[in-house]
């Protein structure tokens, strides 16, 4: 039997489809999400409704975003979920979550078993809507969750860690083995909770500057910042901020990156493109 077929649907590699089928894991995730009636719940990539059904049971309405036309059609005709669902058959990577929150009159609670091939770019897309989001619960590749929660001085710490923690409080929830899916992925998975900060702990004046600094630093992570960021900061400026120029990208805290971004925004602002 083709192990890519689950509930009569052939998992599509180009959509990165792996369907969750372990009831204990499903119950644990739904319990962590704790959906309540009246909340603006939004699922990305509902697939064969492994999470959609138990979450939908607790709600009067649920919004789902599904790129796969066949799966969106299945949900439309679902015996008990159908009437509760608002289905957007489109790519979450281009979806306007701000408009949806405005339409629903409250911040969104977003969740999903995300396709691993788009999880990192989708995170960055969602970070741009954190004003419109109450919280997020996602199943991701375990390695991505490790990067989201990593602190300085660790191999997993990178640009994703800095940007995620700038916007959100990041909390690992549970680990999930490949056997919980059909077809089983080649990697371990984990569930993470991201709660956008009500008050930014380290506000920056221009997010594009923070994005640029972290990109340049981590693209050359083995170099000291004296070298990787030498085109942006002199040794004197770094020292004046209390940042050792001999440190590497992975040694610098989120607070320090934000401090550097604010210095640059004030002293060498980016031109509007």
Swiss-Prot record:
InterPro entries: KsgA/Erm, rRNA_Ade_diMease-like_C, rRNA_Ade_Mease_Trfase_CS, rRNA_Ade_methylase_Trfase_N, rRNA_adenine_dimethylase, SAM-dependent_MTases_sf. One of its GO terms (molecular function) is RNA binding. Belongs to the class I-like SAM-binding methyltransferase superfamily. rRNA adenine N(6)-methyltransferase family. RsmA subfamily. Keywords: Cytoplasm, Methyltransferase, RNA-binding, rRNA processing, S-adenosyl-L-methionine, Transferase. Its EC number is 2.1.1.182. SUPFAM superfamilies: S-adenosyl-L-methionine-dependent methyltransferases. It is found in: Cytoplasm. Specifically dimethylates two adjacent adenosines (A1518 and A1519) in the loop of a conserved hairpin near the 3'-end of 16S rRNA in the 30S particle. May play a critical role in biogenesis of 30S subunits. S-adenosyl-L-methionine binds at residues 18, 20, 45, 66, 91, 113. Signal peptide: none annotated. Its main location: cytoplasm. NCBIfam families: ksgA. This is Ribosomal RNA small subunit methyltransferase A. GO terms for cellular component: cytosol. Pfam families: RrnaAD. It catalyses: adenosine(1518)/adenosine(1519) in 16S rRNA + 4 S-adenosyl-L-methionine = N(6)-dimethyladenosine(1518)/N(6)-dimethyladenosine(1519) in 16S rRNA + 4 S-adenosyl-L-homocysteine + 4 H(+). It comes from Shigella flexneri.
